Structures are given as structure tokens and as C-alpha cells.
Amino acid sequence: MEGNGTENPCSRTLGWLHQNNDAKPWLWKFSGCFSLPEQTLPLSSQTKEYMENKKAAVELKDIPSPLHVGSKFFPAVPLPDIHSLQQPKVQLSAIPKVSCCAHCPNEPSTSPMPFGGGSGSSGRSGSLIHTGSLLDSPSTGTVTCQVGSDFAFQSVSSLQNASARNNLVGLASDLPSMCVDSNLPSCKHLSCCGKFHFQSCRSNVHKLHQFQTLQGCTSAGYFPCSDFPSEAPGHLEEHLSHSELTPHLCTNSLHLNVAPPVCLKGSLYCEDCLNKPARNSIIDAAKIWPNIPPPSTQPAPRAVPLCNRCGTKGMEKETSLLATSLGKAASKFGSPEVAVTGQVLETLPPIGVFWDIENCSVPSGRSATTVVQRIREKFFRGHREAEFICVCDISKENKEVIQELNNCQVTVAHINATAKNAADDKLRQSLRRFANTHTAPATVVLVSTDVNFALELSDLRHRHGFHIILVHKNQASEALLHHANQLIRFEEFISDLPPRLPLKIPCHTLLYVYNLPANKDGKSISNRLRRLSDNCGGKVLSITGCSAILRFINQDSAERAQKRMENEDVFGNRIIVSFTPKHRECFEAKSSNAVVDKAKSPKKVKNTKLCLIKDTGEQSPSAKAMPGKGLQANSGSATKNTNFKGLQELCRMEPKSGNRIRDHQQGHGSLATLPNSGPTASVPTLKNTGVRETLHRSSQKKENLSSQSIASSPAQKKKREGTVFQISYPSAFSQLIASRQVSPLFSSQSWSPRSMSPNLLNTASPLAFNIANPSSAADCSDPFANGVDIQVSNVDYRLSRKELQQLLQEAFSKHGQVKSVELSPHTDYQLKAIVQMRNLHDAICAVNSLHRYKIGSKKILVSLSTGAANKSLSLLSTETMSILQDAPACCLPLFKFIDIYEKKYGHKLNVSDLYKLTDMIAIREQGNGRLVCLLPSNQARQSPLGSSQSHDGSSTNCSPVLFEELEYHESVCKQHCSNKDFSELVFDPDSYKVPFVVLSLKVFAPQVHSLLQTHEGTVPLLSFPDCYAAEFGDLEITQDRDKGVPLEHFITCIPGVNIATAQNGVKVVKWIHNKPPPPNTDPWLLRSKSPVRNPQLIQFSREVIDLLKNQPSCILPISNFIPLYHHHFGKQCRVSDYGYSKLIELLEAVPHVLQILGMGSKRLLTLTHRAQVKRFTQDLLKLLKSQASKQVIVSDFSQAYHWCFSKDWDVTEYGVCDLIDIISEIPDTTICLSQQDDDMVICIRKRERTQDEIERTKQFSKDVVDLLRHQPHFRMPFNKFIPSYHHHFGRQCKLAYYGFTKLLELLEAIPEILQVLECGEEKILTLTEVERFKALAAQFVKLLRSQKGNCLMMTDLFTEYAKTFGYTFRLQDYDVSSVSALTQKLCHVVKVADMESGKQIQLITRKSLRPLTVQLLVVLMSWEGDAYLPVDELKRHYETTHSTPLNPCEYGFMTLTELLKSLPSLVEVFMNDKAEECVKLTSLYLFAKNVRSLLHTYHYQQIFLHEFAMAYTKYVGETLQPKTYGYSSVEELLGAIPQVVWIKGHGHKRIVVLKNDMKNRLSSFDLSPVNHEDQPAVSRQILEVPEPHLASELHLRTGPSQMEQELLQLANSSPVDLLCAPVPSCLPSPQLRPDPVILQPTDLIQFEEHPQEPLGVLFLNQEEKTEIPIPVKKGNLSCNSSPSSPASASAPPKPSSEAPGLLISKDAVESPAKKQPKNRVKLAANFSFAPVTKL
């Protein structure tokens, strides 16, 4: 059959009842099944996918006669009236024949069984075969058979004889794998319909979707609905849920009272079959069959029906089956065909579906099959499907979606996604073809929202007269919607889609290659085989001798490879390829290699399965075993309404099935295979029951789990080898169940999981393990039998509990039945819910659909709970063992065990589960209660973590109650107790008083360890003072409780020592680990660790600390706890809210913060030493931070403490008697201790932060402002900062990034932004007052801008504020009492105007900040003084220069500093040493300052861009590096200062032009500092540009007697010759040019009035001061004393209006590339100075 069709990927060959003559006794091939290979039934070429052929109707003339095929298939079977079977192929109008009728004989001895031989769509009923003849049929070849039987049982009436029924049942059990596919790929029918549809598979029967059959036709592989023997129906019912028992029809005419048959589509039915009701219930026909009007066509003439078996003629009267009589029989896939009297009605109007799946896509993880089904069910009523096409790029679309569409017979057209509108063009083409092919009336369904289809829809509707149905999304265009007759929203159409299940799970298949050359090396052969099998995905596993094993990903690939490789040449040898090994050694090698491969790649094993063939050993001729195989999990798109069944359901089903199997085997000597009971896995055949023998053998041979066999019981010694299966689970939930259900499979055999071999516990894959004994599996309970718990977190706590429960109930009820909804109490804003659903399938659907579903204002997080209800016994045994191993004598009272268990693991314990652990624990009755004891075989500790040798923790250390190792302990020490007559019966616990001591912990600690050493590690607390007195003298016990520390608490302050409670209630002082701690152990490792608790207990522990720290000495009587709690917190302490019934239980639940002292009713409550140390550390850090020097001397500690906390210092408040005792407990990473003048100094340990960390902290301060501005009232709890920061910015707040180790330290590093307020234990973060007003101003601007006219009535302020920002406005947050006072503080933002209707708040009109920015830049760039300028000085210079006051409020800022801080890219604001606010230019604008000065030396203040770099280098004295400023080129750098320059032009003609606003030159006298001596040095500090040292100075002296002539005087202060010295930058160039005649307007009157005034000043000095005797009378004479260094180069002042032509511009002296106007400073030859550039 391999050439006739393809098989299912999970199929495999089956062994048959007769073996080949040349086969080994242990090997079974698939030979002998049929007579001749050429007589096999021809297969379709497309049997892999049952829906690949879209044609709904098939000509019967193309199909061979069913009886003819049956006769060819089984020639040895004698048939009556054989002449009636030899007839030509039937035509469409011919009457098909009924299989048999009541007139046919039924002999009990040779009960014939109707065997489906073909497709029911052609009206065939199958052939009749006898059991004996079938078994005796010879075979000559190997035939691959497919799973899914087409056989049918006879009716009960014809099987009255018991033997006949037994024979039939045995044959039915032995032949589960016989199936012959027909040539019709669309649907395959049997003569008699039934309930189970079996997919083609090789060894296992997989239940697929129960297809709703056509009228009178049933899908292939269905059992008869009513004709099961007495045992078979019940056997099959065990594996079906009630929902899967759908109504069905039967076509069998084997009833005794034969009525006229009724024909539908070529099949004949008797009245009994039609009138018989369904097995379970009658379904309303109106709900089953679509309401399609009956066609008006006339049925074709019919002949008299004739029985296919005996030739008896029936009646001529025929009855047509209509919708009202048969019920719904529409196909799930493909077009609903309405067939009456064998003819397909072609008169129905056509319908075409055109789906733009890229526009209206299938939701992620949802089933495309359901979408197609809904389209067909909604629109195809009364129509015939003519077209169903979707267009997409299949390489971009989900492969599973494409596969589902192919399975649904949808045409998937591929287009290139990169081409523009390719999908739309293809769909428009399909629409036009549809219009050309079909005529009205016709219907077009377009699934798209694209407006491009509007033209086509309009044409189809108005020109062709088609009915247009548009399935669109919400955002569809009106132009598109206008052209449709019917509109349907796509969102509603795809609502509640079920999740898409995986189509198939790949299974690895092995292929064996023989006849390989022996003289070649393995690598060459491997390469050759790999080349032959590469196209099929083969992998060479091993090469042994002349054979090799190849692995393929599925069966199809292996079959293709077999065809390609068969008889191929491999180095001169013709190889033979087979699915079965030839020798036993080959099989063993294959199994070992498979195990190795799985061990190497466990991840691959999780997703795939290896189909292994297991050796069956020698067996008797009467009992032949078929090769075993791993379970095949198959869940495809056709699966619907199936329940997820885990391993436990399979285990529960196995005992009944196994017993029936064994009965059939013993009665008939055949092997039975069970039909699958679930969509995910099959039930394997289990014949062996010896679990202990299996485990014993596995421990001896160390066999791997996947290849070991299970021994049989003594009654079945001859059937020694069985089948061991691997079970693979399709989902992670099932894997979770499986991993926890291994142990219960063996619990009933009294087998301890501790004795399991390591190979069993640590296999390569957690999914593979043995199912040992079916009978033992009967005790396994379904973990989800009582419902499935779903945990819902991130629930909106602002909603009421009732509203939340209702919303959750409504949301989850859409996905299945909800059993209960439970909410956790409101505590610490951590509200969670537990929703219990009916089954696992509904729970999985709910988790997939509702995860991150928004309820209220939050998106809930949904996950499947794995709580106590789903815990397996194996996990319970581990937890029980860990508790009992740490208990005294490995025993605990039952009530104490339950208490510890529930507190340790956080969930309830079912006591009945403990009785199931009979192999591990024993529960004994003792006295008035029960005792839980660990069996001796399990008392050894599992790991050193729980052993007495461990010093890093103990399980008892984390449990609320600590027990002594003995069940009973003496109340007092008999040796040292002063009261020799002490008796427990007489002792009254209420009379005990807790002693208070005054001791040093350094002295007391070694004494206690010594005392425990002499008392063998335990000292009763009652006699501790007596024992201590006997060893070291009397204790210093004080009667004043306010001056001492409780002895019981003081003992627990010693590292490694604790006080435990024995089971008789006696408190005992003991070592934590029952031995002295090592000398070098960290004390913190010896403290009790915080147990993992729920949020309620964490909140309660904080409240306990806050309550007790306000009590004297942190001690509180237990009787006063409730009233003080109520008084302190203003609420009741409800113990039930925390899950407890008694207060003492609640107090014991927080042992890491609360210690209970004493006994009886006079017990005292205090904080543990660990909590006290933590509390003292916080107080100490607060005290140190309050000091200016961040340190304090121990002698001044009391005074500093009083100043900081406003109360006297008392060391007993922290549970110790000496300060040094508790300081020594603080880690060195927190504080630093140093010695200073015989006194100890305590200081905070800090490290210097880098400059990068400081810059990051500045950025962090901006983030904090942004975060808190989004919080109500600009404040938030401290503990919410980190999650809020992460949520707001989408990144983690890493403290090390800013140079801190604690968040509080980081927040305290920005005191100008943030304040940390403490309200008891809770810390609140809020903005400072300045930042609050800034934030409020921004809110007011937003609020007023949203109002009409940018104004708001004052009376409406609070209402509009709450409406806009979601919380009320509080005046007290801003320290004001009225809105008017508030507006005065916000005068830079709002103003109050008196209107007729009242006072109105108006938004002021701000001035533009851009002109002011330019003006401030000019002032700063013209400043010739220090590198920075005080803010006040800047304001004064601005007002002096522009003669206008500078009011920041006009620009929307309260102060000038805030205004400058809003320009971070231009200036920097900082505090100098004098605590003055100063401002300076940024490094980028210092560069801009130099550019401005450079351009001022050029004519028209512009320069070519390509000359700029060289000119700048000459001018400044250093090379221009744009990368220094963070830019890659000069052009980008200049573009970063748009306020100063701009670039115009193109190409090489681009020029750099100074902005007009920057051309103004301010007076140097106004901006220069008074002291000019230090200016050059300071100027060099600004830009740090080294200036060349000039050895000579050139002075221009002008005096009263020298006014008419100019004298150049050279003053040489260096011995070096002037010519050898560097040329000064201001020295005139030797190039001489005549002055151009330039007429300039001059004031001649002013010129004649002062003829002898100096007209210019020339500076030739760079470093030393210049002598400038200038009489300043009228006007401002430029005194540019700054050198032309890059740091201080500034523009000369603007010429005075009185004498514009008298002043020398700097251009005339320093311009390097332009002709100068006529200079007022003349030399002898009347030549002007040439351009001079700086060196």
C-alpha cells in the first residue's frame, strides 16, 4: 500500500497473527495480512489530511464497486449469491445495495462480520468475512495498514448464541487496526454509522472529532450505534464523557421486521434503524439540522431495492429523509450539501467568501477552524459554497492557522507581503472572477476593513445584483460600509473563540539500513547516508557492522526516505531499507542509541517522542504479541469539546480495561488494544503486574526507564516480556501533574519512594516513566476531580469585595462553570482571589483568555494554582519527612504536626492523606491524641541542610514553634535547683515572674556557653539562675524593671543560643544546632531567619514593632495587647483576618519580630534581639545624619540622642544593658568605629562618588520630580517607590548606578527635591515646598488652559481640580488658608480678577522666553571677568544694559534662578564657596562665545565654512575637535548653537553667519571687572588654553606732551633678543596697503572740540597689564584690556552715539582676511595696520 497513499505521521506497522516463514521467532512483521499485494484496496493519494480535496461531490462512476473490491481484498471468504456481486460499476441513478437483510442466514458457528471495504459515500456496506477464513488467508508481502477500523458488529438479534458473541468480541478486540481508506478524501462513510471515528494510525486508536454525519452517511471508522454485543458498548462507554455521546444514525437493515427501506444519497435504511432513538437522549431536530428550505427538485426515478447479500427485493415505496425526520447531519467542514434521492441540488444560489486575513486576522492562539465554521454556519444556509478564499503571505502567517485553513478546505492564496497592496489586488481579482463565473442571485461575503474594496463591492451590488455581506472591524470607513447589504462586526464574530490546540505532536521514527559495505569507515558511510536522507530530515544515529539506524522526525519523512534510499548504491553495495530490524542485536543497539540520544538532549525529548519497537521475546503459538510502541498523542484542529485527561484518568481507567483485555486474551489467544479515551494519549496494553520484581530488576541491571521491561506474574511466565510505554503530555499543566504522580502509582504496593533507583528519579526527561501495575493505579485519584483552582493576582483593591466577586464571577463564567470565588483580605494592598472551576479544560481556557484582563483599573494576572488541592502524595511525603526528621525522636503529636505543616507551607493539610503514606509514617493512638511517627527506614536525613551538622540554618529555626529533641524534659535542673521539693503538679505557671538582669553581653555570652557545656547542652529556664549561681555566682537581678533586661530575652541575644519549648511546655536553654557554634561563624548566620509569610503577617509584624517600641523598655503584658492595639491603630485586631482562631497563635506566627516571655497568664511581649538591632541601626543612622559632621562621640551620645529624638537615652529600650553590646551587632558596612583621644567615635561609612555617579544622581532627581508629579498630592509611600519607578519609567532603579547601597541614602542625597517624612514605621516621600509649587503651577496651567477663555471662577476651582486630576485639592499642603493666598504665591502663573459674577482666576500671558535668552547670552558672552557670574550680578548687568527691570514672573518663573535652570543646555547654575547662586556658560556655549568673538573680527561677521576650522584654530590657539563637544563634524557643532550662528548657502560656498542678535557689543566698562590684573590668568582658567609667554611688551604711551605724534616704545624685560622671541599677536604685519577711501558720517563738531584726545588704543601685551592713561570725559571710550585669548575674547563696545567714528573697532586690528577702512591711528607712511592673526 505504500505506493497508493500516505499515512498518518503517527502511524506504524502492525504485527499480524501469522508470521512469515523466514522470520525469527521473536520478530513479527506485517506480512500475511492479505492474500496478494496487488489485490490491496487502492488508497487515495491524499489520505494524510482528510479535508485536502475541496470537491464536495464525487462521481460514483470513478469509484470501484464496493463488493468487487471486497471480493478482491478477501478472495478466500465464501459469499452467498456470488453472482450478484459481479456487476458493473453503478451509476448515479443506480440503487446501492444493502449489506444484508433479515432473510440472510446467520450460522452461530461461522458468524460473518461485516467489514467495511470502502467509502460509504458510494453506498457501499462492506464485505462479509468469516473469522476463520480471515485468519487463514495467506500473505506474501509486507503491507502497511492504517488504524481506524471499518468493521461493524452485527445486531444483537443476530448474535444470540454466546459463542458467536464471544467469537465476534474476540475478533473485534484482535482487529482494531484494520482499515482501508477510500478514494474519497472529503468524507468516508460506512454502511452503519456509529459513535467513534478513528484516525489512521498504526498501533493505537485515537479518537478524533465526532463528525456530524451526512444524511444517511457516516464517516469511516464508526462503530454501529446500537448493534454492540453485550460487552462492547459498556467497554467503549468507559472512555467517553457524557458530552461526547452525540446523537447518531444507523443504516443497518439487520432487524427482523424489515420495513420498506428509506434512501438518502445512495444508502438504504430500514425503519427500525430510523425510528430507533439515540442511545442517551433525543436531540431536538430543529437544533441539529440547519433551517434550510427543502429543495424543489424532483427525485430521480428509482428501481426496486435489492439486498446485497441474499438478493431479496424490497418494497417499491421509498421515503425521502428530510431535515425534520433525520435531524442535523451537516458536515463540520466543507459546504453543507443538501442531497435528496442521490442527486446534488445545483439550483441553490452560490456564495463566495473572500477573506483579507491580513486585515481581519485570527486572534493569537485562537482556532481558525472555528472562524471558518462560524462563517459557514451563519452565511451558508440555503446556499452552495462556490468560493472560499483567503489571501496572505504564508511565510508571514502562523503555520498552524494556514494548516487549519487547509484542513477546512479554504483556498489559501499566497502573495508577496513586500509588494504594495498585493493582497487587496488578489482579492479584487478573485471578486471579479466570481462575478464573471456566477450570476445573480449570489452572495459575496467580504471579510475586510480595507476601503480599497469599495469600488468592487459597489460594482457587485449594483451592476451584478449580488447580495453583499461585509464582515468588518470597528474602524471601517463609511465609504466601504455604504456598499454592503448586511454589516457584521468582526470583533463580535470572533468573540469567545476557543484556543487553538496543537495540530500534531511529532514522533520520531527509526529506519534500518542493511547491506552496507564492511570495508569502509563509518564516517564515509555516515556522510553518504546523510546525503541520501538529507531531503527527508534524516539523522544517522549509529552504524554497526553492515547496518545503520536513521532517525526521522515523523513517519512521512521516514517513508519518503525509504522510497528514495531503497536499492541505492553505497560504495558498491545496494542497500536495503526497512522499518523493522533484521536481527535482535540491531534492535538492542537501536534501543541503546535511542536512550543515549534522549539523555543528551532532554529538551528535545520534551517536545517529541521516539516510536520504539519493543522486543516481545519467545511466546506460545496461541498468544502472539504485537510490537509495543510509545503512546501517540494526537490533538488536531478537528478536536472539539474534548476534556483534557491527565495521567490519573488514564490510570483510573486501566484496571477495568486491563481485566477485559486479559479475559479476551485467555479466551481467544489474541492481543487486544484499547481505543483511546482522550485526545491526548492512548491507553497502552498492560499485561504485567509485578511491580516489585520490575523495580528489583531495574536496580540490578541499571536499565534506563525507557527501555526496561516489566516482569509478569507467575501465571503468565510464558509471556515474560511486555510493553513499556513512554507517556508524553501535550501541555505544561499535564507535565506538572505527571511529575507529581509518579509516586502514587507504587504506593499501594508498600513501596517506599526512597528506595527508588536514581535512574528512576533522575531520568533525562521528566515526561518518561513507567506505568507499572494497572491494579495499583486504581487507587490514584484525579488531582482535578474536585475542581481546578485559578489564582488571580494584581486585583484592584479599590473596588468593594462584593463588586470584585461579581466581576470575577462574570468574567470566568464565560469560559466554563465556576464553582467558587474567594478573596483574600485587604492587607498591604495585596488583594488576591482564588477562582475554582469545574474542570481543567475550562481552567486552561480561562487562563489563556483572561490573563492581563482589565478589571477595574488594573490588569489581573491569572495562573493555574498548584495549591494543596493539586498536591500529590509524593510531594506530601517529602514535606512530611522534612518536618518529622527535625522533630524529637521523629515523632510529633498530630495537632502539632498539622500546626507546623500549615504554618511552614502556608496551606491546609488533609489528614486523610497522611493515612495513605503507610510506607513512610505511622499514626498511633497515644493517650488522648494521635502521634505521627516516621518509620525507622526513613529517619535518615535527606540532605545536610536539615542535619545537626549544619550551621547555616535549620528547619526548626524557621518554624514558629521550636521543640526540644526529647518528648519530655525536666522542668528544673535536679543538680542545682534550690527548691529540691519542686513538683510540676504543684507549680503554678501564673506565679512565675520573669527576672530582670543588668549584665554585659560580652561577659555573659561565654558564661552561658560554658554552662551549656557542663549541662550537656540543655538548661531548664526555671533553674537557670540557680545553675548560673553554682558556676559563676549570683546573677545581678534587679527589682526595677525599668533598669534591667528580661533574663529570657537577654539569653536569646547570645549568638548560637536559643530558648526552645519542650513538648511538655517546659522552656529550655539550648544551642540552636545542639552543639557550640564554630568560633569564626558570622553571628548573623546564627540568628533565626524570617519565615516566609503572607503579606498579612508581614503587615502585622510591622504593626507589632510600631506598637512595642512606644512601650517602656519595649515590654508589654500579653493581656494588654488587644486594648493597646485598638488604641494605637484605631482598629480592632481581628485574629480571624490572619487565618487564626486564637491570639497566641497569631503572636507565635511572627517569631522573627516578637518574643513571648514567661509563662501562664502573666506572659510578656517584647521585640526579638534581631528586631531590636535593626531598629537601633535605623535610629543611629538618623542620629548621625542629623549631626553636621556625620559622626558622634560615644561620650556625647546621650546628649545627641536627646537632641535628635527629644527623649532621654535608655539602652534598655533596645534590649541590652550596654551600648557597646548593640553597636557591635551592627555590620561594618553600615557604620565605622574609630578611636579618638581615649574615646570611641561613631560615623557613617561613606565612599566618595565619582563624577558620573553625581551626574546620574542629578538626572535621578529629575526622574523623582516627574514620578511624584503623577502621584496624588505629590507624595507616595516609601515602600511603593521602587515598583512605581519601574512601572513609570520601564526600567529598574539600580542603586549602584548612583553610588549608593540603600534607597533611603539615595533619596536623602537630593534634599532640594525630596523630603522623607516619617509617620511611625511608615515613611512618606514628598516634594519640597519649592518643587510642590512648581508642580502646582504646572497643574494650574493645564487646568486653566482646558477652560474656556483660560479662566476659571474661584468657587469652581476645587471641583474642576478634582475632576481633572482625580483627587481633592488641599490648601494645607501649601501652608495657606485661602485660595487668594495661594494665588499670591502663584503670581507668576495666575492672577485674580474681579468680575461681575465674582472673583475669577485667570492665566497670565507670559512673555516669550526666546528674546530674553538671547539677551542673557549676550551679557554672559560679553562678561570679561571670572568664569562665572553671580545671579544677582547678572540681573544688575542686564538691567543696566537694557534699562528695563528683569521680572521672572513675566516669563512664568518665580525667581531668576529657576528661569536659568530651565535653560540647562545654555547655562549652569551652582553654588559657590560663599553660598551664592552663580551662573556660567556650558562648555558648548563657551565655544559659541569664541565663535562670536571670531566672527566679530570679520567683515559682515561671516566666514566660509571650509575656512572656519583653520581660522578658529589660529584665533584660539588650539585645534578644533568637534568630538570633544559630542559631535562628529564642524557643521553639526555649529548647528548645535543656533542662537549664535547659522549656516547659509550650498556646497563649498556655504558660509557661517553671526546672528543679528549676537552682533550687539556691550560696553566693556559696564561688564569688565574692576580689577584687571588678574583677568588674563582667570581668562586662561576658563578655557584652559595655554598662552605663549611673551618676553617683550609693546606699550603705546600717550601723554599730554605727546598727543600729536605716536611713539612705539619697546620695553624688553628679557635678555633674549627681541627678534628671537615669539612675534606678538597684535604686532602689525609687514604687509602694507593704502587706505581705501571710505566716506563715513562723522561728527565734525565733536571732532574739532576734542582734537587731541587719543583716537585709539593698541594693545601689544598678552600677559602683563597695559598702561592706558585715558581721560574719560564724554562718551565711553573702549578699554578692551582683555587679551585675545579664547577665554576672554570679547567684542569691542558699541560706538557711542555722540562720536560713532572715534572709536577703534577690534575689526581694524585683528581681522585676518579683509580690507580695513581708514584707520584713525596713522603711521609715518599713512599705511594702515595689516590684518593680524593670533599664533
Swiss-Prot record:
Compartments (UniProt record): Peroxisome
CDD domains per the UniProt record, alphabetical: LOTUS_2_Limkain_b1, LOTUS_3_Limkain_b1, LOTUS_4_Limkain_b1, LOTUS_5_Limkain_b1, LOTUS_7_Limkain_b1, LOTUS_8_Limkain_b1, PIN_limkain_b1_N_like, RRM1_LKAP
HTH OST-type domain mapped to chain residues: 872-946, 1000-1076, 1096-1170, 1172-1248, 1256-1331, 1332-1407, 1408-1482, 1483-1557
GO biological process, one term: oogenesis
Annotated NYN domain residues: 351-488
Biased composition (Polar residues): 673-688, 705-715
SMART domains: RRM
Keywords: Differentiation, Meiosis, Oogenesis, Peroxisome, Phosphoprotein, Repeat, RNA-binding
UniProt superkingdom: Eukaryota
Keyword Cytoplasm tagged: no
Known partners and oligomeric status: Interacts with LIMK2.
Protein name: Meiosis regulator and mRNA stability factor 1
Organism listed in the record: Rattus norvegicus (Rat)
